[in-house]
């Protein structure tokens, strides 16, 4: 009997690296998909995603490059004219780092990749602290996209959209990843810089807070390492 297969959207960050480990631990052959879409730290993210795939022994690693999201703009991740804001961990506003409808674009590519390779699942590392600010990280979005996949693929295709951390905090993810031996030294979260991480953008803040909550030291280098606990 052939092993079950899953595509993992591999951003290079700690959430997707942990999602890949969870999929692998559940018995899936992992097909990792990394996309460069014009984000400011795309080279570092690609480097990290490649290292993660090697460490996990991924069955395949696909790197896609697309520029339409950066041409559309309206996000500080892709638009040089928009500054990446300092961390505001209490805000309920949609942050400037939101890339309009990005996850639908990425999941569409992942579904194509999955169907072409007879994969039965797609994993994405979105979590509860994401959907407080990003509308395309909400459980309702993934439920709706699941219906789109069912309607838009071949009749005999069955692909489940899995967001295993959708009810988890960043701390929960870090704790599980440490249990699974995720190489967090080969992950990147910073929105601003490729080395060292800034330590003060939203992504750095939530990441540092997760490790601090667990009493662990984040293994990557930071320009600043504030306390977020």
UniProtKB/Swiss-Prot annotation:
Annotated residues that bind ATP are located at 10-20
Q: What is the official name of this protein in its record? A: 7-cyano-7-deazaguanine synthase
The entry's free-text remark on the cofactor is:
Binds 1 zinc ion per subunit.
What broad class of enzyme is this? ligase
Which reaction is catalysed here? 7-carboxy-7-deazaguanine + NH4(+) + ATP = 7-cyano-7-deazaguanine + ADP + phosphate + H2O + H(+)
GO terms for MF: ATP binding; ligase activity, forming carbon-nitrogen bonds; zinc ion binding
Q: Could you tell me the EC number(s) of this protein?
A: 6.3.4.20
Q: In which pathway does it act?
A: Purine metabolism; 7-cyano-7-deazaguanine biosynthesis
- HAMAP family, per the entry: QueC
Keywords linked to the UniProt accession = ATP-binding, Ligase, Metal-binding, Nucleotide-binding, Plasmid, Zinc
Q: Does the keyword ATP-binding apply?
A: yes
Q: Which family does it belong to?
A: Belongs to the QueC family.
Cofactors (names): Zn(2+)
Where, by residue number, does Zn(2+) bind? 190, 198, 201, 204
On whether rRNA processing is a keyword of this UniProt record, the answer is no
* Biological function: Catalyzes the ATP-dependent conversion of 7-carboxy-7-deazaguanine (CDG) to 7-cyano-7-deazaguanine (preQ(0)).
